[in-house]
UniProtKB/Swiss-Prot annotation:
It comes from Shewanella denitrificans (strain OS217 / ATCC BAA-1090 / DSM 15013). It is a peripheral membrane protein. GO terms for cellular component: plasma membrane. InterPro entries: AAA+_ATPase, ABC_transporter-like_ATP-bd, ABC_transptr_haem_export_CcmA, P-loop_NTPase. Keywords: ATP-binding, Cell inner membrane, Cell membrane, Cytochrome c-type biogenesis, Membrane, Nucleotide-binding, Translocase, Transport. This is Cytochrome c biogenesis ATP-binding export protein CcmA. It comes from the Bacteria. The complex is composed of two ATP-binding proteins (CcmA) and two transmembrane proteins (CcmB). Residues 21-227 form the ABC transporter domain.
Amino acid sequence: MNIIHQVNEAKVTSNKPLPALLSASLLTCIREERILFDRLSFDINPGDIVQIEGPNGAGKTSLIRILAGLSRPYSGHVSYCGETILACREEFNADLLYLGHLPGVKSELSAAENVDFNLTLSGYQDFDTQAALAHMSLAGFEDALAGHLSAGQHRKTALARLLHTQCKIWILDEPFTAIDKKGVEQLERLFLAHVDNGGCVILTTHQDMSLIKAEQLRTLTLDYRSL
């Protein structure tokens, strides 16, 4: 998707394209003397849903950690709105929501306390925790200790923050793990609403999606070869 920014001032129009929301430039990743991907380049624009796929060990998690700035590539760089993420770390982090394959839920806190903790840690003040949990089908579990919740409820507790975040870039590692079909559809609707508002979603998953159609989804396949 090419986003064109037009400035009308004194009857002058500029058709200069905006930089991509997130760009990978010639990324190479080597783990344990094995090349996972080599010279990988792509742009992710507002409105994009990108699924990273490939066999186990192909480098999916390594790639999304590099995109999130949590790992360094062997070579190449990642840019946010035209600047390398190393040069604009604060701005990039403020616009990024990353959820790893582990839900990151604290077992000694309740479901509501976990949502409050994560959103407050991200700088948010005005949010409706109960509404977020209800949207994730966790109404009635607000006060339940996370340590007593199922794996699917853990994942939903972690994902509840998506309801209130203002970050444009969502990077999610296996967000559908342990979630039933209804829960997957709830998340798909959330993804579609997010990209309709100018955000982007980057995810890994082994599950099929029923609401996000093929024409709405970009796929990036890692297969151990130079890309």
